[in-house]
A protein has these predicted regions:
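Short, small-residue-biased leader/transition segments that mark boundaries at the very start
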Residues: 1-2
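C-terminal regions of RecA-like/P-loop NTPase motor modules
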Residues: 5-10, 14-31, 42-123
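Conserved D-loop beta-strand region of ABC ATPase nucleotide-binding domains
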Residues: 37
Length: 123
């Protein structure tokens, strides 16, 4: 989402909320899934546990309020190079309006930009 220059944080938050509501209405009207991506604040990387949480979305409150599902991706090697299993990834279900939350262990194949279930790669 691009904001007009000169807007304060409050005005940007309001514009973002309008954009998110409009996108949600469009998704419902067309029956098409909508994927919104976001970087989290750099303060997350500096925590003892840098795994993403729903509270980390801060100014993106409109996104987490209107989203049916919110996912977070955590790769230990991105925060502590040389530790853990290379390619190991946690896909964290932070919000699921119609189901449970938790995480799935995935493996990231960087040469193909592909994730697979770490426990059942044939699935």
């Amino acid at each position: 989402v691009l904001f007009r220059s000169g807007l304060g944080q409050r005005e940007q938050d309001e514009e973002l909320a309008v954009a998110v509501r409009t996108l949600k209405a469009l998704a419902i009207e067309t029956g098409v899934a909508l994927v919104v991506t976001s970087d989290l604040p750099t303060v997350v990387a500096g925590r003892n546990d840098p795994r993403p949480g729903l509270g980390d979305f801060g100014a993106l409150g409109a996104v987490k309020a209107h989203a049916d599902i919110v996912l977070g991706v955590y790769r230990e090697e991105m925060h502590s190079p040389g530790t853990g299993v290379e390619g190991a990834t946690e896909l964290r279900v932070l919000k699921n309006r119609n189901g449970g939350t938790g995480y799935v262990d995935l493996y990231f194949y960087k040469q193909w930009l592909r994730f697979e279930d770490m426990l059942d790669p044939d699935r």
